[in-house]
Amino acid sequence: MYLDIDKCAIGNSYDKPYQVVFHEAGHGIDSACRKLVNESGVFASHFSGAYKGGLFPQTIKDEVMELVNAYDKQLKQEYKARGEKYYKVYAYKALENEIRAYNSYARADLSDILEGATGGKVQCGYGHGAKYWKDRTIGGISDGLATEAFAEMTDSTMSNPESLELIKKYFPKSYKIYEKMLEVMLNG
């Protein structure tokens, strides 16, 4: 891992000081601990992707779909009442607009996770791009989503309380799995 520590120390418009250090350290830990998971038929490159057969990225996706489906239900009714045609893309856009209302420090990590979980259908200003997520799906497991979410949760836990608050709000089940993964990593 190579970082410009002087730049990391001051942060930027969406990362708090040292947040990038904790993010990259999260990736390093996630990769180094991969060997702790010995699940047959799981080809993920990272601990977070391999853990319990992809439980972490699947839970993230499930939580995102719960949010999208809640908007979908509400918006369908509103559009029907007005006699207008409705498309599910409106639900994704509504979630995106909700997240974009938060400041950059609070939403950047969440934005990346949402982009990964939706394959780019939700883009809140920060992310890796749709191709990144597609290229990092291994054996049906969204390994890219897993490792980025692991790193985002690590950096927010260590250096960005605003971001952590939103992650816990939008991904409570996934964050609990993150904590369980840390326990497994620590206990080897």
Please report, for each region that a protein language model flagged, where it lies by residue.
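Active-site-flanking segments in enzyme catalytic domains
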Residues: M1-G188
